A protein has these predicted regions:
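Hydrophobic, proline/glycine-rich low-complexity stretches
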Residues: 1-60, 152
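Catalytic strand-loop segment that frames the active site of acyl-thioester-processing enzymes
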Residues: 1-22, 98-159, 173
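Generic signature of intrinsically disordered, low-complexity segments enriched in small/polar residues
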Residues: 8-11, 30, 54, 63, ...
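A short linear-motif detector with a strong N-terminal bias
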Residues: 24-29, 40-44, 58-60, 109-111, ...
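Homeobox/homeodomain signature
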Residues: 37, 88, 123, 131, ...
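HotDog/MaoC-like acyl-thioester-processing domains
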Residues: 39-127, 192-194, 199-228
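Acidic/His-leaning functional-site neighborhoods
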Residues: 135-212
Length: 228
C-alpha cells in the first residue's frame, strides 16, 4: 500500500473521521429514499470527496441531497446523488452508484427496529489491516442509514456494502492514502457476512493505485478502491 503523507495531529484526524462518517451517511440516506429498487445490490460507487474540514461543516447534513436516476435498464440503473442546484457552489461533493438487480429475488420477513450497535469490531492490529463487522454494527447502520433492503435482514443477511466501504475509507485515510479533493471508484465484487474477517492489501501491480479488501480465510476479493 503506497503511503504518500502522514498526519500525526489527533485533533485533525478526529475531525476528518467525523466529517467523513457524517458525509457518507448523508449520501446513503438519500439513496435509501429511492423507491422501487428494494433487494437490488451495489455494483460500483464513484465518490467525489473533499477530505479537508470546511467552515460551517455541521450544516452539511441539512443540505438537500437528491437521488437522480441518470441511466436506467432492466437489470441495472445508475444513480447520482448530489447537492441541489442552488447548493452546488457551496457543496460540490457527490456520489454515483450502479445498482444491479440480483438474479434471484430475496424475500425476508420484516423485523422490528434493532438496538444501537457497539463500536466497530476490529480484530488484529492497525498494521495488518484486519477488520470484522459484527451483526449489531450492521443493525445500527441500517437504522441510521434508513436502509430497509431485505438482503440485509434475517439469518442469511449480507453486510451493507456502504458499511464496509466507509470503514475501509476511514482506515485508508488514517494511513495517508488520500488527501484533499479525491475521486474514488469502489467496486463491490462479492458479498460479505457478519463476523467474517477481512484485510486490506494493495493491488500488487506496479503503477496501479488500488487497494483490495479480501477475506482472511480464502483470500476472496470483496471490494476494490481505486483513485481516479
Amino acid at each position: 500500500m503506497r503511503v504518500r503523507f502522514t498526519i500525526y495531529n489527533e485533533e485533525v484526524e478526529n475531525t476528518v473521521n467525523d466529517r467523513l462518517k457524517k458525509k457518507l451517511l448523508c449520501f446513503e440516506r438519500a439513496l435509501s429514499t429511492l423507491e422501487g429498487y428494494e433487494g437490488w445490490m451495489i455494483g460500483t460507487t464513484t465518490l467525489h470527496l473533499d477530505w479537508q474540514p470546511k467552515q460551517g461543516e455541521n450544516e452539511f447534513c441539512h443540505t438537500k441531497l437528491t437521488p437522480e436516476i441518470i441511466k436506467k435498464g432492466r437489470s441495472a440503473i445508475r444513480v447520482r446523488i448530489a447537492a441541489a442546484e442552488e447548493e452546488k457552489e457551496r457543496e460540490n461533493e457527490g456520489m454515483e452508484v450502479l445498482l444491479v438487480k440480483p438474479l434471484q429475488s430475496v424475500l425476508v420477513p420484516e423485523k422490528e427496529k434493532m438496538p444501537l450497535m457497539k463500536a466497530i469490531t476490529e480484530r488484529g492490529s492497525e498494521d495488518d489491516d484486519t477488520l470484522a463487522f459484527s451483526r449489531s454494527q450492521m443493525e445500527e447502520y441500517l437504522r441510521e442509514a434508513a436502509d430497509t433492503n431485505p438482503i440485509h435482514q434475517g439469518e442469511a443477511a449480507v453486510l451493507p456494502g456502504f458499511l464496509v466501504m466507509n470503514a475501509c475509507l476511514l482506515r485508508l485515510w488514517k494511513k495517508g492514502w488520500m488527501k484533499g479533493q479525491t475521486a474514488l471508484e469502489v467496486r463491490f465484487l462479492a458479498p460479505l457476512r457478519p463476523d467474517e474477517e477481512v484485510y486490506l492489501s494493495d493491488s500488487g501491480q506496479e503503477g496501479r493505485n488500488a487497494v483490495y479488501l479480501r477475506t482472511k480465510q480464502e483470500g476472496k476479493e470483496i471490494l476494490s478502491i481505486t483513485e481516479k
